[in-house]
Amino acid sequence: DDEDEEQVYAPISLNAPLYWSVYEYAWVAEQAGSNTNMPEVTWDANIDWVSENLLPYGYGMICTDGFMSMTNDPGIDPGGYMTHYAGIKLTDLVAKCKAKGLKLGVYDNPLWVHCSYETVVKGTEGITVGSLVYNSAKDDVLYPDKGDVFTWIVPSHKGAKEFIDGFFKYYKKIGVEFIRMDFLCLFETADGAGGMPGRGYGREEYELALKYISEAATKYQVFTSLVMPNLKNDAELEKKYGNMIRVDADTMKGGWQHFASNGPTWFNPNGWPSTSNMFTGLISWSHIAGRGKVVLDADFTRLNTFDTEGEKQSVISLQLMAGGPIAVADQYNTIVSGDLKFYQNEELLALNKDGFVGKPLSDDLWNAKNQIWYGQMFD
């Protein structure tokens, strides 16, 4: 471990990632009231499909998401971090991906507790995980009479910084270089999560959390994706500490509704969600994006939920012109025949490879010029 502390890690790309997510499988299963854990045979089929059809075009990662079980086996990792996802060892998922030339990205949050409270935080003199969680005697929260749907650590508690550092060290060690951390609005202000309960730990704790996360992620060279952030004060904290931020509500059933017409056009700059659709989110936050700046994440793409070729061209082209990721959620058995060509459009994917980040001619939601984007490629 001492040698690990001295290790300098190779820099990772900070360009928007191109990847595949389990989101569609899990969301559809949840809506149907069925088991959301993806069977291993389905993992294998999707990994094979991505490797064959998307990896040659730059989609180099498979990523987990919520919905599925997330557990710690102390016999595998006594530090208390997640060892199993959907009942499968994370190291097995890493190996499956690696065998096909892919990396594994993980949906997890360094503020979440997956283990026994008696677990000792690595790098401390006997500090336990239980001492990191909410303590009514000393923690000033927004809603002390409410409970939390997640078990959060409190960043200001002694040992929290070491716990967060250990989180990124653990993931780097098993081969994970992308972490998608969710429900940040619930931690900060206890709202924005569809009525899910939360105490709300406030702005100071939220900033301290992001600071520790940024320091550890930079140290171990892990890309951070901040999900469901409030983006208060023009995203001052998120753009300072994160690599990528979500700018619109969840994909859910997808389609044109999530791309451009999910209810009336509205924008809320100081709370989650800031807007309901990709188009509004990417336009409204375009002023904070740029080369070397925070990446705008418009959430997952489900091409099988769009009706026309024009709609499918639009959802891919806008995200890439805005310098955002493409997070494919179509699966090997749900992709519509002929739709792969939209994900494989090399002319548009060249924008991602270049690190291109475009801007709309206007960021006024009611000005038609917001449909025209411009920018300069290096080549």
Q: Model features per residue range: what roles?
A:
Residues 2-105, 109-115, 325-328, 336, ...:
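Conserved structural scaffold segments of CAZyme catalytic domains across common CAZy folds
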Residues 24-42, 148-163, 308:
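Active-site mouth loops of central-metabolism enzymes
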Residues 103, 177, 223:
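Residue-level detector of anion-binding/catalytic polar loops
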Residues 74-88, 155-157, 187-213:
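Active-site cleft segment of glycoside hydrolase catalytic domains centered on the general acid/base Glu
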Residues 30-38, 120-127, 189-204:
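Short, flexible/disordered intra-domain loops and linkers
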